[in-house]
Regions:
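Extracellular "complement/coagulation-type" protease architecture
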Residues: 2-294
């Protein structure tokens, strides 16, 4: 209760300093991450499951977005989270044989916490195929704040080591000069098992989209509490991450290799095709935290 009171005091101070309504700050930051399991993860999981089952009986393709081929994103993890109210879905990134990076709100969304999760690797479908491991070993960032949606990062430890193959591989972390790069102007690739468009559409398979990385100053025009520890992508041309992609990777090519620069955190409550930016946890801001847990 004391922590909640302090959080609201901090929100009030921020609102006063920027001459905006407190309700506006809270409303912006409680968009797609706060209470994620009940609002998004659990309802979406059942729709994805049904889409996969129907795909087994039909040759229909995905409407909107681009489907991934098996092995195209070998570092992509699918997460099936068992929460108190039901089963939800998220994404993650395989860093080494026993560590998967995801968003904190995929495990604890400010209202409910997961009990266990199935980590799915080497599959373009989340409810079937691939390597599947059950774990509850999740380290959430100690300063994760579900109201501000800050420090939205968590590390999953797998119960046993996974072997690499053509379909399973690790994503590199930024290093050297890349640690000082904000990546604005880069074209990044986001991938996930979430919705392919607003209005209830889901896919039966992994999807991906290329997105321009924008400056935090531009992003802050939409999300006023964007921090330096966030990285954002443009939502122009109705292209963005969407509900269910939470925790998944944002990747760029640098020095001839793919590196992880973001963990999918939140988008705008009004939808994924309205031109609003998407926000991610900036990997370079958490590189020490990540390396300590590898």
């Amino acid at each position: 209760m004391k922590l909640l009171a302090l959080t609201f005091l901090a929100l009030a101070a921020l609102a006063s300093a920027r001459n905006i309504n407190l309700e506006d700050v809270i409303d912006l930051e409680m968009i797609t991450a706060y209470d994620y399991h009940n609002k998004i993860g659990i309802p979406l999981a059942e729709k994805i499951r049904k889409a996969e089952e129907e795909a087994e009986l039909s040759s229909s393709r995905i409407v909107g977005g681009s489907s991934a081929s098996l092995g195209q994103f070998p570092y992509q993890a699918g997460l099936i989270i068992e929460a108190p109210a039901g089963t939800g879905v998220c994404g993650g990134s395989l860093l080494n044989s026993r560590r998967v990076l995801t968003a904190a709100h995929c495990w604890h969304d400010g209202i409910s916490q997961g009990r266990s999760m199935t980590v799915v690797l080497g599959s373009i479908r989340i409810f079937s195929g691939g390597i599947r491991m059950v774990t509850s070993n999740v380290a959430v960032h100690a300063n994760w704040n579900a109201l501000f949606i800050t420090n939205d990062i968590a590390m999953i430890t797998l119960p046993s080591a996974v072997s690499t193959s053509s379909n399973v591989g690790f994503i590199a972390l930024p290093s050297g000069n890349e640690l000082n790069n904000d990546f604005a102007g880069f074209t990044a690739t986001a991938s996930g098992f979430g919705r392919t468009r607003d209005g209830g559409a889901v896919s039966d398979t992994l999807n991906h989209v290329n997105l321009p990385v924008i400056t935090n100053a531009v992003c802050r025009n939409t999300f006023i509490t964007i921090q330096s520890s966030n990285v954002c992508t443009s939502g122009a041309n109705a292209r963005s991450t969407c509900q269910g992609d939470s925790g998944g990777p944002l990747v760029v090519t640098s020095n001839g290799r793919r590196i992880l620069i973001g963990v999918t955190s939140f988008g705008h409550r009004d939808g994924c095709q309205r031109g609003f930016p998407a926000a991610f946890a900036r990997v370079t801001s958490f590189i020490s935290w990540i390396n300590q847990r590898l």
